[in-house]
Design a protein with these regions (language model features):
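Exposed alpha-helical structural elements
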Residues: 2, 17, 53-56, 112, ...
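Polar low-complexity intrinsically disordered regions enriched in Ser/Thr and small residues
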Residues: 3-4, 30, 59, 67, ...
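Short alpha-helix boundary/capping and kink motifs at helix termini
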Residues: 18-81, 85, 91
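Generic secondary-structure transition motif, activating predominantly at the C-termini of alpha-helices
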Residues: 7, 11, 26, 62, ...
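Basic- and aromatic-enriched surface patches that contact anionic nucleotides/nucleic acids
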Residues: 75-153
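Intrinsic-disorder-associated interaction segments
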Residues: 8-15, 35, 106, 131-134
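N-terminal leader/domain-start detector
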Residues: 1-29
Length: 153
């Protein structure tokens, strides 16, 4: 869980990289804010989350350890870029807001990830499937590596 948490972190570098990518891609200047965003305003862009990862994010949220999500504000839309497990866990816990890094585009630009979400029929958190019968790929990889190291010892 510790390894996964480090990889899943919304580090300032990760946020800055995504911010600069948007600026270059669309030829705009964005602003960055750290704020709470209403869960009902968030537009997810991912169609599934893994139950084991959801359990980890729920644990972190209950203890105040969860990293902020990454959200893009474009026009009057709040697009969830990173933090689907955290946001679903927040919603399940009854939280009305999600701690987020918000990249504000300052104008209405339809993002590619919005188009992809539209094509997949993802509009709200109700459209996200929780996968119970499989592990998050990162957890499966971590456990495979641990098993290999155990066999070598």
């Amino acid at each position: 869980d510790m390894v996964r948490s480090h990889i899943e972190r919304s580090t300032p570098n990760k946020v800055d990289y995504f911010k600069s990518t948007l600026e270059q891609l669309y030829g705009i200047k964005t602003t960055l804010k750290h704020m709470k965003v209403d869960t009902d305003k968030l537009r997810p862009t991912q169609d599934r989350v893994y139950a084991d990862e959801l359990e980890g994010r729920t644990y972190e949220l209950k203890r105040g350890l969860a990293e902020p999500a990454i959200v893009v504000k474009t026009g009057n839309r709040w697009i969830l870029v990173d933090g689907h497990h955290r946001s679903v866990a927040s919603k399940k816990l009854g939280c009305e807001k999600v701690d987020s890094y918000v990249i504000d585009l300052g104008q209405d630009i339809r993002l590619g990830m919005e188009k992809t979400a539209d094509e997949a029929g993802i509009k709200t958190f109700d459209d996200i499937t929780i996968i119970d019968d499989d592990q998050h790929p990162l957890i499966a990889l971590t456990e495979t590596i641990k098993d290999q190291q155990y066999k070598e010892d």
